[in-house]
Amino acid sequence: LIGDYKVGTSKQYISQIIDSNDIPNLGESMLIASPTGSGKTSAVIKMIKHTSMPVIYVTNRKMALCQFKKDDIKASKGLDVPAELLDSISLGENIIAITYQELAETTYKYKGKKHLLILDEVHCLLEDANFSVYAEKIIRYLKANRDNIARIYLTATPDAVTPVIAEIECESGQEQALFAMDWDTNVKSVFHAYASYKTRLKMVYSMESNWNYINFKLYTPDDTKELADYIKRENEQGTKSLIYVNDISKGKVLQEVLGNTQHIYSDEDKRAEIAEIAQNEKFSDRNLITTKVAENGVSLHDDELNLIVVETLDPITLKQVIGRARVNRKNPREITV
């Protein structure tokens, strides 16, 4: 049974409803499902301070990893570390921060060892399973080591992650749990779906979403000039834009039309630039064209970033990209998507 669940309002931050001492016991898990910008990382950093267990923090992108390291060092040591030094500074004796891919390659190091495992952006275990084997390796590792690991799952898109959680956490009735599971704002459907089955998920924290600050528009993907002209007009008014594309070739076409535009297509070829964006929490040009490398994890605190272009039919990707532009949850500025 799920022990309990709490739901916060769209104007609250997750740290206002979560107890930093409420850390899962070994063999148990917790789900924090709240929108981007609601303070999941800050809440987790506070929880890390309250545990004596070794901690492994895992996320799916280098950009998100830089952001976590920056936030953790600032919270624990009070330091604003230059981007180029992030990799050289230790997070602490008992804290490791790695990507899911790195964990998949090194699970043998942690087999049978007791620790707190924080799985950020955990929906990626489903999203990336179509083109990478790391997700399957990690799920196998989690199921084989449930007794010696305390688990905290973090996601802004819970509807995309419940099947993974059911597979890992349900010890009986998994097929029925997967069939019955659905997600709503109040978490009641998840609660009832698990209620008949033995599960190790003991706590769910959820936050309501607010999309009222978003002004949605549609464009024709093949008409690059029309889109570029719109972006240029917005730039002339002082607006910066984040442009998410599915393939690099489309990004290069937009680069040519928009001019010498800042772009990041891989987290390997522009590590210094990625670290700089994470450090400054904004990009330097009027426009940034990117792919999945900046889909999640990075926080852009820039009041000039008021236009987001997303080339996708996937609502999960849409939510993740919108969430890169951080707004004040109590009084958000208007953003065109």
Q: Whereabouts are the PLM-identified features?
A:
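Interdomain hinge/linker at the junction between the two RecA-like core domains of SF2 helicases
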Residues: 158-230
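Conserved SF2 helicase motif VI
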Residues: 311-335
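Inter-Walker segment of RecA-like/P-loop motor cores
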Residues: 72-109, 273-279
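Conserved Walker A/P-loop ATP-binding site and its immediately adjacent core
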Residues: 36, 41-43, 47-77, 160, ...
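Conserved helicase ATPase core of P-loop NTP-dependent helicases/translocases
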Residues: 262-291
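A short beta-strand element within the Helicase C-terminal
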Residues: 289, 298-312, 336
